[in-house]
Amino acid sequence: MSEKKETPILKAEHLTKMFPVKKRKLIEKQKYVHAAEDVSFEVYPGEVLGIVGESGSGKSTLARTILALTPSTSGQVFYQGEDITDFKVSAGEKRRLRSEIQMIFQDPYASLNPKIKIGNAIAEPMLLHGQASSYAEAKEKIQHLLEVVGLQPAVFDRYPHEFS
């Protein structure tokens, strides 16, 4: 296998997230649940990373830690070579990063408003973050992206509950 020369888009180094368990006694030593422990990976342009595991294995916690929705216990996260661990950057930089790095949580019913069509749910952040200057431009871009991932443009006008 050849060595990668380019900078990874996303990189995690020894990322760990632990949650304290409530103590039952004052003198009891603090215990922790290890939700994600010593996770390292690199994602290069054109690659896809799938995080697979049983329910409760820490997949969502890992994703939330990468996106700094939950602070890490230790380790580092890099986006395009820039250390973004816990988003210790300016408010403007956080806004830029959050427009470029996003996730949809595994329960689509909790992630997507059931009263808003898929196309509108995707168009809103595009318009908010300046990735489209009008609704018509956003719709055109979204329909193209739907085709790229193998979905029909008609998906734009469907509601979340219409997907299996």
Predicted regions and their residues:
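Q-loop/switch helix immediately C-terminal to the Walker
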Residues: 107, 114-128
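ABC-family P-loop ATPase nucleotide-binding domain
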Residues: 1-32
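Conserved structural motif at the start of ABC-family nucleotide-binding domains
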Residues: 10, 34-36, 98
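The feature captures the beta-strand-to-loop junction immediately N-terminal to the Walker
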Residues: 52-53
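ABC ATPase NBD coupling module
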Residues: 26-29, 84-102, 128, 135
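Helix-to-loop junction immediately C-terminal to a conserved catalytic motif
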Residues: 67
